[in-house]
Amino acid sequence: MGLIVDDDNDGEVLIPPPNFSMVEDEIYRSGFPELENFGFLSTLNLRSIIYLCPEPYPEDNLKSLASNNIKLFQFGIEGKTDPPTPMPKDTVLSALRVLVDVRNHPILIHCKRGKHRTGCLVGCLRKVQNWCLSSVLEEYQKCAGLKWRQRDLRFIEDFDVLRLKQCLYSIIYQYNGYGLKRRKLLYQEENVVQEQQKPQATKG
């Protein structure tokens, strides 16, 4: 079930979602949160959740998100399939764009168990952060446990982070070193300088 935390303020027992952990400051990952986990999640002051499954989000969970002003971003990626299907690169890229936008932080990433789909997205984030590939793959395997998938490792290895830079039309996320604490968000409009057209005088 995960670690049980006692809230010193009112004695409430707080239960994290399965496989919960911190990725970076204000970025978290986990398995699918149940209603019993939302007390714990409220302590994170989340702004957003990235949900990586195709199934509709439970109505009770949606109500809890609404009451806490948490935005839900759903990217429907199939889990275990027979035969196995490749991870959709464009979908992961879209999720990554949401993830690197600090306006969505604090943010939680989750799929069903918080291992494979979540692990692939976090692995791609690490590549954006310029982690060495061996460390990226090691983190994926550690979080996936005995059920790590070779095809996920190949996906992370082959994922082209240059595509992210090409697709960030209005936001450039600039990393200084490996950490996110010294991050800097630069807002850039597609047309940085837009001259206002003034009415032209007409000759009578």
From Swiss-Prot:
Keyword Oxidoreductase annotated: no
Keyword Chloroplast carried by entry: no
GO molecular function, one term: inositol-3,5-bisdiphosphate-2,3,4,6-tetrakisphosphate 5-diphosphatase activity
Known catalytic reactions: 5-diphospho-1D-myo-inositol 1,2,3,4,6-pentakisphosphate + H2O = 1D-myo-inositol hexakisphosphate + phosphate + H(+); 1,5-bis(diphospho)-1D-myo-inositol 2,3,4,6-tetrakisphosphate + H2O = 1-diphospho-1D-myo-inositol 2,3,4,5,6-pentakisphosphate + phosphate + 2 H(+); 3,5-bis(diphospho)-1D-myo-inositol 1,2,4,6-tetrakisphosphate + H2O = 3-diphospho-1D-myo-inositol 1,2,4,5,6-pentakisphosphate + phosphate + 2 H(+); 6-diphospho-1D-myo-inositol pentakisphosphate + H2O = 1D-myo-inositol hexakisphosphate + phosphate + H(+)
Pfam families with a match to the protein in the record: Y_phosphatase2
Site feature: Transition state stabilizer: 117
Active-site residues (renumbered): 111 (phosphocysteine intermediate)
Reported function: Cleaves the beta-phosphate at the 5-position of soluble inositol pyrophosphates. Has highest activity on 5-diphosphoinositol 1,2,3,4,6-pentakisphosphate (5-InsP(7)). Possesses low phosphotyrosine phosphatase activity in vitro. Dephosphorylates the phosphoinositides PI(3,5)P2. Hydrolyzes O-methylfluorescein phosphate in vitro.
Protein name stated in the entry: Inositol diphosphatase DSP5
Native organism taxonomy: Eukaryota, Viridiplantae, Streptophyta, Embryophyta, Tracheophyta
